[in-house]
Amino acid sequence: MKIALVQTNPVIGDFARNSATVLRWTAEAVKAGCRLAVFPELTLCGYPPQDLLERSDFINAHDRHLSTLTGKITDIGIIIGAIEKRSGSGKPLYNSAFLIDGGGIKARARKQLLPTYDVFDETRYFEPGSESTVACLDGERFGLTVCEDIWFEGRGYRIDPVRNILDTETVSLDFLVNISASPYHHGKINERNAVFSSLCRKNRLPLLYVNQVGGQDSLIFDGRSMVFDPRGVMVASAPGFRENMLIVDSKKWPAAPGLDLPEDSTATVLEALTLGVRDYLHKTGFKTAVIGLSGGIDSAVTAAVACRALGPENVLTVSLPSPYTSRASIDDARELAANLKCGFETISITGAMDAYRETLSPLFQGLAEDVTEQNIQARIRGNLLMALSNKFGHLLLSTGNKSEMAVGYCTLYGDMSGGLAVLSDVPKQMVYALARWLNTKEEIIPERVITRPPTAELKSDQLDQDDLPPYEVLDPILQAYLEEHASIDAICGRGFERKTVEDIVRRIWVNEYKRRQAATGLKVTTKAFGQGRRYPIVQNFQG
């Protein structure tokens, strides 16, 4: 049987668009001679719909479109992820997979393992299914599962949906189908490959895995739909970060040669960020972006990502020099914009600084300058960039990296201003790696931007390392504390100075209020600031 694995890029709540996408790809699968087309988890509404699931009008609209779509599926069978209503005690919905054929629903599988960790909160809305499902089409029998149902190993679940299928079936299965909406983070590709390979070897079953693609708020879904054979060898794979239809034949894949597993590299992170920016703007109705160019590496990489995502003609960059801005920074910003072929403007903030100084002088008389005056500069820049955003309809992209966000080395209502924080989950050392990769074929980012010491240039002779440890020290400590949940003692046991570790941890805690007010940031690590990291602002734990 020829099967199409279709990774789609839905828009949450746009049932008409999502239905049309399913029909378009279904028609392509029919043309290709496929008997079955498989779509991702919650294809019809998009994932994750969050509290839209608590609205009866949302559920009713979903059901109307599902009914209409079902009636139109006559020339091929499809498996599609959708919401299913339920009655009785417990939650009112299932997260289900439907096998539709001949204009009707022939089988359904209800997701049994509901993830409630990091960015996932499915028990808030869904009731877990209680039975495993085997479906049949043209004599071929397959287990039907939804996303987390095949992630039993190492997750602490009490039931194994795949094992339950095999233990209750007296007739052998031909393959296993899993429909997913599995978001990307750096390392996720390798993690998936290990889980899927082990699953297939353990159960001696081929796996057909179909994943959602596209950006949704902070989440980026990478697609990469795959087929693994009973040996645990990947024998077919769709590309990452774009809609695609992968066609496989259930009679041929047992003899298919193994493929090289995809790499999770710096280039992959760049692809993820590019898709995240593109979809965030396009799905929210923005066509253009504006970015403040400091002449530093963070704004340079942000601008490069934006140009890749939107096209340079849709990106405006702005240099906002002050008396503390070096000639090198001004020249590097201009050179970067020329290399990217994007828009470039210069607005001096010196006059605005003078106006602030004069306005505040009666109240500040006799007081020495401190971080207050530095923050005023950042807020002037944020104000001017937001004015350009308002006047011309650009989305302002903020440029701060994860290392700075973690320790509060950023200005609320200043450089934190914006509608999307492109690098807020990218540690500083990874920013450098992205810059190097961008320069692989030609110099996009001026070499001096990469090699000179980072500086905010908010006062004379300022360097980041006047206020922060070197990033090669800071980043590993942040990763250990934020992503691995290591204690201060455990981090010190890795050879880091206790005073440095304690200072970094203190900064993390006291700046929670800043991060709570930050723009939505694109998630590319295992633990990003945002919906997957929930800590109180007011608390007194410093461990």
Describe each PLM feature range.
Residues 2, 204, 230, 256-295, ...:
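ATP/NTP-dependent adenylation/nucleotidyl-transfer catalytic domains that generate, transfer
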